[in-house]
Amino acid sequence: MATVVLGGDTMGPERIFPNQTEELGPHQGPSEGTGDWSSEEPEEEQEETGSGPAGYSYQPLNQDPEQEEVELAPVGDGDVVADIQDRIQALGLHLPDPPLESEDEDEEGATALNNHSSIPMDPEHVELVKRTMAGVSLPAPGVPAWAREISDAQWEDVVQKALQARQASPAWK
């Protein structure tokens, strides 16, 4: 890590304030009465200047609930939308463009509906699907040991008791 030498002193990664021998800029000087920690005039002067390090300042938020009420404009109002976009640009924010309505998505949805309706779902086919899915089994490592040791009926009892206990206990707020 590089170090910078100023006036014979070394500066590390932490911020070092200039010492008495270095030149201070117009906004950087020590304020009078720094040894006195009372809440007198110097603090008020500091608040009035409004500029801190690197030009940042404190701006209090509105605390009056009556003034916070804002009427929402209709979405289609062009002047309001343009005004909002101007404000976003002035603040230096980037708002991504909304996704375009794609005709491909509509075609895919229509194709899916056509495919769904073309599958014959008569009672015989439903039973075939059920038998096929019943024959599907997960590999043994995918099922934890505790799940192999408890029957479905026992597991349903455990779940029901847990749900009843949760409903009976007072809700924590």
UniProtKB/Swiss-Prot annotation:
Acidic residues bias (residue ranges): 38-48, 100-109
Q: Which residues carry this modification: Phosphoserine?
A: S102
Q: Which InterPro entries does this chain map to?
A: MEA1 (IPR009685)
Q: Does the keyword Phosphoprotein apply?
A: yes
Pfam families in the cross-refs:
MEA1
**Keyword presence, Protease:** no
Where is region (Disordered) located? Answer: 1-78, 93-122
Which superkingdom is the protein from? Eukaryota
Keyword annotations of the record:
Developmental protein, Differentiation, Phosphoprotein, Spermatogenesis
One GO BP on record is: cell differentiation
Please explain the role this protein plays, according to its UniProt record. May play an important role in spermatogenesis and/or testis development.
Protein's UniProt name: Male-enhanced antigen 1
Which organism encodes this protein?
A: Macaca fascicularis (Crab-eating macaque)
Its encoding gene is what?
Answer: MEA1
